[in-house]
């Protein structure tokens, strides 16, 4: 063992009171640290994907089996595309786009950015299809547009989601934005992404309740299979959101620093604490 290694071990042992079996013992740190966190992380990511995919499947079964299937003809079957597209787009794909920075934390940042933006684009397209479907149905059935809290929340979420995607494209994928501009917008972008996911799930819960009251209001209190299935969908959506927020906000799951991120941090610190940046 080199002199430097002996000094390092002595320092670690001194922090634990000199006891080899203490919580800061070097061997224990090596044995129980990253591997254990990695396995927990993988399990949580897997659980989130199961919850998200099952939510989409439940929505498809609900609309396909209990509500008559899917079509693009202005009928109620066209409306059935709305919940399916919104759960797939604004919830599952949106959540997965956020999660790629944790799952692919060791990949090149540019590749992860492209994947993040591409999944968000797919989520946006899918959600627009869902909104067009419900507007078509309302027009064909002479139902007023945008009168419910669900519709207000859904349209607001979609507009903000679209704006979020455009702003992310301008600030992080196009090379025009300076480092200090990106550093200023980065925490806003992260906060808005999670907020929009919460808004999407909350609006979905409103939509589930609204659909049940319109479709099976009289039998809903009798725990009919359709009502129970829709309630389970709501629970799964909430659990998906909780897991996503947990994975994204835990410090140990954050992407390891790289030169680009360190530069952003320097600029952000300069903006918030004052002083001149070390680099232009």
Cite the ranges covered by each PLM segment.
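Polytopic transmembrane helical bundles with strong interfacial aromatic enrichment
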Residues: 2, 7, 36, 40-46
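Non-transmembrane, juxtamembrane loop and terminal tail segments
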Residues: 2-33, 256-280
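Membrane-proximal N-terminal segments immediately preceding the first transmembrane helix
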Residues: 2-3, 12-37, 56-72, 94-102, ...
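Juxtamembrane membrane-interface segments at transmembrane-helix boundaries in membrane proteins
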Residues: 29-42, 68-85, 113, 140-153, ...
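Hydrophobic alpha-helical cores of multi-pass transmembrane domains in eukaryotic membrane proteins
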Residues: 47-61, 80-98, 115-132, 152-170, ...
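Membrane-helix exit/interface motif
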Residues: 62-68, 95-106, 129-144, 167-177
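Transmembrane-helix exit/juxtamembrane "anchor" motif
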Residues: 98-102, 170-177, 242-261
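Juxtamembrane loop segments immediately following a transmembrane helix
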Residues: 163-188, 198-225
């Amino acid at each position: 063992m080199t002199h430097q290694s002996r000094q390092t071990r002595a320092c670690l042992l001194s922090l634990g009171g000199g006891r080899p079996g203490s919580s800061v013992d070097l061997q224990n740190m090596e044995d129980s640290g990253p591997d254990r966190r990695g396995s927990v992380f993988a399990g949580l990511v897997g659980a989130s994907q199961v919850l998200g995919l099952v939510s989409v499947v439940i929505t498809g079964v609900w609309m396909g089996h209990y509500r008559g299937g899917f079509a693009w003809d202005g009928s109620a079957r066209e409306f059935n595309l709305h919940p399916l597209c919104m759960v797939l787009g604004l919830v599952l794909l949106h959540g997965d786009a956020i999660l790629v920075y944790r799952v692919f934390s060791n990949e090149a940042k540019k590749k992860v950015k492209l994947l993040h933006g591409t999944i968000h684009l797919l989520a946006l397209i899918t959600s627009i299809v869902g909104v067009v479907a419900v507007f078509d149905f309302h027009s064909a059935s002479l139902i007023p547009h945008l009168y419910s809290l669900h519709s207000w929340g859904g349209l607001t979420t979609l507009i903000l989601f679209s704006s979020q995607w455009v702003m992310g494209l301008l600030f992080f994928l196009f090379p025009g934005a300076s480092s200090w501009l990106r550093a200023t917008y980065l925490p806003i972008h992260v906060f808005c992404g999670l907020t929009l996911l919460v808004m999407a799930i909350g609006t979905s819960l409103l939509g589930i309740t609204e659909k049940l009251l319109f479709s099976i209001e009289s039998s809903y209190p009798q725990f009919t299979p359709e009502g129970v299935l829709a309630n389970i969908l709501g629970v799964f959506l909430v659990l998906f959101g909780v897991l996503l927020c947990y994975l994204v906000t835990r410090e140990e799951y954050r992407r390891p620093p790289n030169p680009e991120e360190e530069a952003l941090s320097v600029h952000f610190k300069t903006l918030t604490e004052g002083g001149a940046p070390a680099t232009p």
